[in-house]
Amino acid sequence: MWKRIDHQLKIKAGDGPQAGQFKELGPGREPAVPHPLSLSEFQTVPVFEDISQHVKEVGSQLVKKVNAIFQLDITKDGKTVHQWTIDLKNGSGDTYRGPARLPADTVFTIPEPVFMELILGKMNPQKAFLAGKFKVSGKVLLGQKLERVFKDWAKW
């Protein structure tokens, strides 16, 4: 029979010399296999962190040019695993993890491999959208402004 006392696993040793005695097993261990959706597995995390740094440096200029809020839902196996927001409408711009704090003008639902190909310039965004590789809701034409932001970031 298992009992948990003081956050350490203990087992009742019924066949020991003294009935009712507890044997300490030691502290619990971390699972041998990491969580399947750990942040280190995603290539988009460092990309968005770098984009965030870029927005901090030139955000006020981008706000004047773009004037929109973009939410990007990054998916894996059809499930959203990350949400990022690029706010180029308010203040001097901001990029943060999570859903848009204010209503997003455009929401992209995009698989991570497709996003990485778009960011690296290996795939044309218009052709990918028309081929159904990702979904866009809201003001679809603002996607062209986001494409320019990504190209500007790539040169940075």
UniProtKB/Swiss-Prot annotation:
UniProt xrefs under Pfam families: SCP2
InterPro entries, alphabetized: SCP2_sterol-bd_dom (IPR003033), SCP2_sterol-bd_dom_sf (IPR036527)
One GO cellular component term noted in the UniProt record for this chain: cytosol
SUPFAM superfamilies assigned to the protein according to its UniProt record, in alphabetical order: SCP-like
Ranges where the SCP2 domain occurs: 44-156
PANTHER family: SCP2 STEROL-BINDING DOMAIN-CONTAINING PROTEIN 1, STEROL CARRIER PROTEIN 2 SCP-2 FAMILY PROTEIN
Protein known as: SCP2 sterol-binding domain-containing protein 1
